[in-house]
Amino acid sequence: MIVTTTPNVEGRRITAYKGIVVGEAIMGANVVRDVFASITDIVGGRSGAYESKLQDARETALSELEGRAVALGANAVVGVDLDYEVVGQSMLMVSASGTAVVLD
């Protein structure tokens, strides 16, 4: 499965558009990790706890996106957009959307 942010795939022709597909993931952050992440942010370091959560959420959203594209009979998703949003006090939502297509 080819997943790309570009509107097409160089050297390949889109032969069918199957529709818009979306994958979403909402992850809760652990309170203890939040405290340590805040301390890390204050001293100017990177927060490994948040980075790990963000990576997990992104991978889950993209995996769902691919699964929905496969269910439509697509072999690629073009024009993929990733959006990140904090929900409530400690929830992270990642959504991935794009167009499921068939490439030759």
From Swiss-Prot:
Q: Which SUPFAM superfamilies match?
A: YbjQ-like (SSF117782)
Q: Which domain of life is it from?
A: Bacteria
Report the sequence similarity comment from the record.
Belongs to the UPF0145 family.
Name of the featured protein: UPF0145 protein SPO2021
